Amino acid sequence: MLVPIVVEQTGRGERSYDIYSRLLKDRIVFLGGAIDDAISNLVIAQLLFLEAEDPDKDIHLYINSPGGVVTAGMAIYDTMRYIKAPVSTICVGQAASMGAFLLSGGEKGKRFSLTNSRIMIHQPLGGFQGQATDIHIHAQEILRMKKKLNELMAEHTGQPVEKLEADTERDYFMSGEDAKNYGIIDSIISRNTITGGSR
């Protein structure tokens, strides 16, 4: 994928940035695509950098993701909780699976969805081959992760754990309005009022 370059005029002349670095200057982190260890490490590094720059200023995490590896997503989530800077989450396009979990884990009152975004929650997926004992061990770990994710999402949404358990048994799709009623987001936005943009 070709990453666009942005050229800016400064007092010292021209500076060029790749688009993601330019967004980082405005404290915007973009999480696009499937969440794996490489993507997770990039997002974590950006969050830690912005925390070091200004621990009191909001960070805006834009999410357009089908989900991904649970441990990679949990690493991002734990970093969001670890840093002092409030992390606002914004769904653009879709936030599914671990993407929806991260969306719900943003700062209360600062979790958003754009008008036509979709959100989907479900239970963790897993596949493992090997000896019966090892398969059993991995199945137990997936069940432990499922329980933990449901408990955390219940905490963020205000829904009972039992409802999360029932709703995540299968793919559960929501519009922005549905996600707002569910407690995954706080507001639906159609214009940029959160990072100072205007049109």
Curated annotation (Swiss-Prot):
Keyword Hydrolase: yes
Protein name: ATP-dependent Clp protease proteolytic subunit
Catalytic activity annotation: Hydrolysis of proteins to small peptides in the presence of ATP and magnesium. alpha-casein is the usual test substrate. In the absence of ATP, only oligopeptides shorter than five residues are hydrolyzed (such as succinyl-Leu-Tyr-|-NHMec, and Leu-Tyr-Leu-|-Tyr-Trp, in which cleavage of the -Tyr-|-Leu- and -Tyr-|-Trp bonds also occurs)
InterPro entries attached to this UniProt entry: ClpP, ClpP/crotonase-like_dom_sf, ClpP/TepA, ClpP_Ser_AS
Transmembrane segments: none
EC number(s) reported in the record: 3.4.21.92
UniProt feature coiled coil, ranges: none
Function noted in UniProt: Cleaves peptides in various proteins in a process that requires ATP hydrolysis. Has a chymotrypsin-like activity. Plays a major role in the degradation of misfolded proteins.
Localisation per UniProt entry: Cytoplasm
HAMAP family: ClpP
Swiss-Prot/TrEMBL keywords: Cytoplasm, Hydrolase, Protease, Serine protease
Gene behind this protein: clpP
Keyword Amino-acid biosynthesis attached: no
Family in the record: Belongs to the peptidase S14 family.
Enzyme class: hydrolase
Gene Ontology MF terms in the entry: ATP-dependent peptidase activity; ATPase binding; serine-type endopeptidase activity
One of the Pfam families matching this protein, by short name: CLP_protease
GO BP, sorted A to Z: protein quality control for misfolded or incompletely synthesized proteins
NCBIfam families linked to this entry: clpP (TIGR00493), PRK00277.1 (NF001368), PRK12553.1 (NF009205)
Subunit structure: Fourteen ClpP subunits assemble into 2 heptameric rings which stack back to back to give a disk-like structure with a central cavity, resembling the structure of eukaryotic proteasomes.
Active-site residue numbers: S97 (nucleophile), H122
GO cellular component, one term: endopeptidase Clp complex
Domain of life where this protein originates: Bacteria
